[in-house]
Amino acid sequence: MIPYKQLSLADIFSDCQDKFENDKPVFLSLLENHIDIDEIIPISFRNHFYASTGRTRKYPLNALLWALIIQRIFSIPTDQLLLTFLAYSKPLREFCGFTKVPDASKITRFKQDFIDDLQLVFDNLVDLTEPICHAIDSAKADMTIFDSSGIEAFVTENNPKYANRIIKQLKAYAKANNFDKSYDPYKAAYGSMPTHASANPEIKQLYINGHFCYVFKFGIITNGLGIIRHISFYNKDFMISHPEIVVEKKSDSPDEDKCVHDAKLLIPTLKDFFAKHPLINPKTFLGDAAFDSCRLYKELLTGNTFGENKHFSKAYIPLNSRSGLENPDCKVNENGIPCCPNDDSLPLKHDGTSTRKNGLKRYKFVCPKIKRVKDASTGKYHRHCICDNPCTTSECGRIIYVYPEKDLRAYPGTIRGTEEWDNTYKIRTAVERDINHIKENLCLAGRRTQNEKTLHADLILAGITQLITVVLADKIKHHEYIRSLKPLIA
């Protein structure tokens, strides 16, 4: 017999109340329970937004900021589509704190009017997430990786037909004049294109990922975990604040121009980063071959470049293929490792690092053709060279000491060609993956605007969203989600 239960009005009310309170998407509940947006927003931002002068705000600061963060978490490509989501989703609207959905112009004005305040939110989150990164992996959190890219603006010059038309004309010109095979129409096209977009002189020509484009250039600093630590937007204000940067005329080589420009931007960008976050003191720098210059090694590894006795201990930078290494004291291979005097193809074996009384390091290299032999009388082991053509009369074989401070380019606190170098330098790709992530997944690519402030704000908001991701992943004890929350949404 089926038992019957008498329903009371109180039970019906209780069920309805429970449904009303709990019928909310789980992901929004996670954000609501674990992220305190008031803790992240500086009081100066709140005072600026709710200034005593001007009109009363119809839309709360928290609501606007949450909406823009949600847009990037869900990879909603346009502001108009975000507003459509808000209009049709009551739970999303209530979570953000809107009683009425704003129009698109409100979103745009918010970005443009409060760009400096958004930067403060980002900087606040960097300090908040630093201990989280160290708790996840202290070694990778101590790394600093830099790379640059650009936000493509919505201008005529970024239409693929624009570059293709010029290249096609140059190919036809070369064919008509019987140019030899050394003529490169792509380099010629780069040289003939204008240095900036006609709509805005601040939208500069750049060669990114194998194609020509017109962009607002920016720089990204991440740690070894791929978490953003600093964003620099290379506009007129940045150049004014760093008069030491001299912008030269472009050459015929787009790759060369990018390398030269990146090398000039590195130290000013790092100085800005360490000035904003004096408690962050990473010891390892990773960069590509664009930074392979004696001047940069000296600034990165010695002196007070980033503060009182504040500099990197190691710099993982591959050698530029156009310039090799030379050592007046001994023969060295392409990685700076000393070679046997009788055989240039035989590198010596790294046998450890020692620190002298004055604190300076030296690297010890020994002949690879030695073995340790036990002395029967003393019971101790000693080196014995078994080379058929020894380069020295010493029984221990050739031993060479290298002093890194004499040549920081050859020995930037570490030794190229070793297993440690290979394993560490692979981590540098984290910054490239991060740039791709903020462009493709955090809605930075494909923005249909050429307004500098709007795109700058979009870049900062992408950084804010990634750091919010780190905070939430830490709160729910799932560090595998520090780069993306998409698995939690599905």
PLM regions: where:
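Basic, short loop/linker segments at the boundary and entry of helix-turn-helix/winged-helix-like folds
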Residues: 27-70, 74
